[in-house]
Each structure stands twice: as C-alpha cells, then as structure tokens.
C-alpha cells in the first residue's frame, strides 16, 4: 500500500490560517507560520481589549461628569456622594449623557446635591 502524505489536508489547514490573516501587513498575511502567530496574538489582544473597553468607557463617563460639575464648585466624588445621600439612582453613563445633551436637567441634579 502506498504512503499517503496528506497534502490536501495540510494545505486546507494552512489555507484556513492564511484566510484568517487576510488584511495583515507583509509576510503576516502570506507566510503560514507568521500568519498563525499573528492571528493567535490578535485573538489575545481582542480578548484583553474587550475587557478594557468597559474600563475605558467608565473613565470617560467619570471625566465628563467631573468636567460638568466643576463649574458648580463640586468635585466628582462630592457629586456622586451627594447623589447617593439624596437616593438618586442614575448610573454614570446616564449622568454623562445628561451632562452633554441635557445640561438643564443635569444642573437640577447638581442643585439637588448642593441643597439649593
């Protein structure tokens, strides 16, 4: 019986990795070994950055809220503490949206916190 080297299976497997590396720069989109390494690394980055997106958005919302309450003589932490004491349950994303899109409503919240 003749030896079967499995060329079609190997080619298909390598082609799959090359296809996943489509759009990569240089040899990463052509060479099998480098393409496979690049794809696996990109999956690692994607996994890590899916977690970081959540952190980054929270940082952005906090920065926006802080920028909106500073002109009223409050810091971010004082504002959030005041909201908790006033039993206002609005998350940071919504507070950020209010500060940008509806400044009058946001000012009412600030006045509520200040006790005016």
From Swiss-Prot:
One of its GO terms (cellular component) is ribonucleoprotein complex. Gene3D superfamilies: 6.10.160.10, Ribosomal protein L20 (1.10.1900.20). It comes from the Bacteria. One of its GO terms (molecular function) is rRNA binding. InterPro entries: Ribosomal_bL20, RIBOSOMAL_L20_CS, Ribosomal_protein_bL20_C. SUPFAM superfamilies: Ribosomal protein L20. GO terms for biological process: ribosomal large subunit assembly; translation. Keywords: Ribonucleoprotein, Ribosomal protein, RNA-binding, rRNA-binding. The keyword Acetylation does not apply. Binds directly to 23S ribosomal RNA and is necessary for the in vitro assembly process of the 50S ribosomal subunit. It is not involved in the protein synthesizing functions of that subunit. Belongs to the bacterial ribosomal protein bL20 family. This is Large ribosomal subunit protein bL20. It comes from Mycoplasmopsis synoviae (strain 53).
């Amino acid at each position: 019986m003749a030896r079967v080297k499995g060329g079609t299976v190997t080619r298909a497997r390598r082609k799959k990795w090359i296809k996943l590396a489509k759009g990569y720069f240089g040899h990463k989109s052509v060479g099998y070994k480098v393409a496979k390494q690049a794809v696996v690394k990109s999956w690692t980055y994607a996994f890590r950055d899916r977690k970081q997106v959540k952190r980054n958005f929270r940082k952005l919302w906090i920065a926006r809220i802080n920028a909106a309450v500073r002109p009223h003589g409050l810091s971010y932490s004082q504002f959030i503490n005041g909201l908790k004491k006033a039993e206002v349950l609005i998350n940071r994303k919504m507070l950020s949206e209010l500060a940008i899109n509806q400044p009058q409503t946001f000012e009412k919240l600030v006045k509520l916190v200040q006790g005016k």
